Structures are given as structure tokens and as C-alpha cells.
């Protein structure tokens, strides 16, 4: 136990050194989040498939309740109930940068050094052409349900339910419930509830009002999360713990063309169509998954009907809703329909990442629309 505490003190020291210009202390989060007696109660899991090289190295690390897939190297790190997925790691000989077409000299590896990842989803698919053989997370602390998607990170703090998507981040603080996909950032502090998407052809920026963030996913003085979305997720956690405790689970009824991960929760009258993907960590209850749909990691689809060819990206939550054909629901979106007040999204729509829809009356989003931000009534659809 003392060695674990010393390890976390070292991690705090490393991350704080990277963030010293912001006078930010990651120890406030770690000291209040980590319950050391629980770190010895959960196993670590390593997935083995015929498609991924078996290579798992760890040293001076705690990885309680976490799941790994693909080539991974973990050193001087604490990884708690996190999902480290290397299913899109590149292989030796692959070409990453078409403008500089040099093949990889060895298989890409996820490298995690001097970091603490707390209930974090890490998904490979790095776009960092400077380190093609390594998908790196160094000197970084990530909070509850943060999402690191295809992004290399060094010296950062990621707030609860934040998403870093397809970029490189250096010495940055990302506030809770923020989504950033903007190439590369150095030494920036991103406020809570910021949606920032930018490339050569497109720029989108939005910021939630503080009252909205406080209601759905605020944090206290020690950066511990609270709010409606956090309570919604934590209420479902016991269902996942059962998946890791029980060996012989009842089979899920699904066509042979569909894939349902063993570590997904499937409850109630859930129906799965052809060519459907249900990823690890997904939660389905009384859900209809139309042909060609998917529920990615950490998604929740409850009392909802997905017509078909639907994508629900990492962390998306769909409750009491109907989603039209070929509609995309982005990262960490929260579509909170009610009984008698359903959310209906027409076909061909895009629900932008980190969108919140929470209305006490039924809402209808027309076909082929893009929606974003906070939608609490029909009038909000005019501006969002």
C-alpha cells in the first residue's frame, strides 16, 4: 500500500511539473479519488485475439479492474477500471503519413508512463506522425470517464467526461465535459463545457453555460464529479461488475452476422439486427438495434429504438428516444427522453459530440439536420 501511495506521489510530481504555469495541483484529484483498499480487489484483463500481437509489459504499476487489448507497455502508472483498446494499432510495414510514406519499422505499441488513468477509455488510432511506432500517454492524469481517442498526450490533466479526439496534447488542462479535436495544443487551459473542432476546412466552437455544466457534470473543489450525468452512469456500475465476476453468462440472442462483446450489459427486451456491433462496456436495456447499427464503448441505449445504420460513438447515452436511419450520435452525447416525452431524431442527422437534450416535452428533430449544445425545449432547436 505504501508503495502505491509513493507511486501516485511521483505521478503527481511529474504532472504538476508539466502544469506549473497554471499553478494546478493534480494531487487534489488523486488524493480524493483513489481508495487504496479497492486496488487489490480487482483483476486486470488482457484480451487475446488471432488478429492482434500478444505483447503486454508492465512494471511498477497498478492496473486494478482494467482491460487491455493489443501491444501495451505500462510503467510507473496507476490505471483503475480503465479500458485500453489497441484494436486499431498499426502494424509493421504500414504507412501512416502519405506525405512522407515511410513504413513503420515495428508494430505500434500503446505506451503509458508516469500516468494515472481513472475510469478512462483509451482508443488507439494515433495521428501523431512524429512517433508512428508509439501511441504515448506520459505524465498525465485523467478523471472519471474521460475519453482519449486517437490522441497522444503528455503532461496533461483531463477532467471528468472530457474527450480528446484525434490530436496531440502537451501540458494542457482540459475541463470537465469538454470536447477537443483541433490538431495540436501546447500549454492551454480549456474551460469546462467547451466544444472545439477545427481543421483546415472547418471550425466549430461552443461553450456551455456554467449552470448547465453544474447541473449535468460539475465537479467539486477536489475535482470529483457530480451532477445528473454522473449519477446516471454510477447507478449502472454494479451491472458491469457482475460481468467480471461471473464466468458462465447466458447467451445473447443475435444473428451470426452481428458481434456482441462478452463485457457488454444486455438487459430486458433488447433486439439485435443483422451486422450490428455491440462493443465492450456498452449498456443496452429494452433497446432495438436496427441492421447495421453499433453501440461503441461506454454507450447506453435504454428504452430506445435505432432504426438502422446508426452510429452511437464512445460514451453516447440514448434514453427513451427514436433514432432515424443513418444518424450519428457523437461522443458523450446525452439524449434524455422521458416516458411520454420521447426524443425523436430524423434520419441522416448528426448529433454533435457532447450534446445534451433534456426536455419535459416530446422533441422532434427533422431529417438531415446537425444539432449541438443544450436543448431543453422546442425553441432551442432554432439556435442549436
Regions found by a protein language model. Name each.
Residues 51-56, 239-268:
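Right-handed parallel beta-helix
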Residues 40-64, 68-69, 73-78, 83, ...:
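Extracellular beta-rich repeat passengers
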Amino acid at each position: 500500500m505504501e508503495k502505491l501511495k509513493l507511486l501516485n506521489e511521483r505521478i503527481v510530481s511529474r504532472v504538476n511539473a508539466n502544469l506549473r504555469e497554471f499553478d494546478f495541483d493534480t494531487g487534489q484529484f488523486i488524493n480524493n479519488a483513489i481508495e487504496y483498499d479497492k486496488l487489490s480487489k480487482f483483476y486486470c484483463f488482457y484480451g487475446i485475439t488471432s488478429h492482434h500481437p500478444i505483447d503486454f509489459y508492465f512494471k511498477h504499476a497498478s492496473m486494478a479492474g482494467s482491460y487491455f487489448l493489443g501491444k501495451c507497455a505500462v510503467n510507473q502508472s496507476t490505471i483503475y477500471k480503465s479500458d485500453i483498446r489497441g484494436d486499431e494499432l498499426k502494424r509493421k510495414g504500414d504507412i501512416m503519413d502519405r506525405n512522407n510514406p515511410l513504413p513503420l519499422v515495428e508494430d505500434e505499441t500503446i505506451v503509458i508512463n508516469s500516468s494515472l488513468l481513472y475510469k478512462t477509455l483509451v482508443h488507439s488510432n494515433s495521428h501523431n506522425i512524429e512517433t508512428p511506432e508509439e501511441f504515448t500517454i506520459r505524465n498525465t492524469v485523467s478523471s472519471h470517464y474521460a475519453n482519449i481517442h486517437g490522441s497522444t498526450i503528455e503532461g496533461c490533466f483531463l477532467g471528468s467526461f472530457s474527450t480528446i479526439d484525434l490530436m496531440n496534447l502537451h501540458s494542457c488542462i482540459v475541463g470537465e465535459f469538454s470536447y477537443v479535436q483541433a490538431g495540436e495544443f501546447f500549454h492551454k487551459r480549456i474551460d469546462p463545457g467547451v466544444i472545439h473542432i477545427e481543421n483546415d476546412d472547418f471550425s466549430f466552437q461552443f461553450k456551455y453555460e456554467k449552470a448547465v455544466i453544474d447541473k449535468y457534470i460539475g465537479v467539486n473543489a477536489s475535482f470529483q464529479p457530480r451532477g445528473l450525468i454522473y449519477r446516471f452512469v454510477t447507478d449502472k456500475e454494479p451491472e458491469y461488475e457482475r460481468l467480471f465476476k461471473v464466468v458462465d453468462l447466458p447467451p445473447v440472442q443475435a444473428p451470426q452476422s452481428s458481434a456482441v462483446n462478452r463485457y457488454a450489459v444486455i438487459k430486458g427486451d433488447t433486439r439485435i439486427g443483422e451486422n450490428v456491433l455491440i462493443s465492450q462496456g456498452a449498456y443496452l436495456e429494452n433497446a432495438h438495434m436496427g441492421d447495421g447499427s453499433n453501440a461503441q464503448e461506454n454507450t447506453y441505449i435504454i428504452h430506445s429504438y435505432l432504426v438502422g445504420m446508426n452510429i452511437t460513438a464512445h460514451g453516447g447515452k440514448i434514453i427513451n428516444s427514436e433514432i432515424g436511419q443513418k444518424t450519428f450520435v457523437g461522443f458523450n452525447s446525452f439524449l434524455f427522453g422521458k416516458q411520454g416525452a420521447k426524443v425523436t431524431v430524423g434520419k441522416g442527422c448528426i448529433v454533435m459530440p457532447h450534446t445534451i437534450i433534456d426536455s419535459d416535452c416530446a422533441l422532434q428533430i427533422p431529417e438531415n439536420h446537425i444539432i449541438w449544445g443544450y436543448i431543453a425545449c422546442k425553441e432551442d432547436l432554432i439556435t442549436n
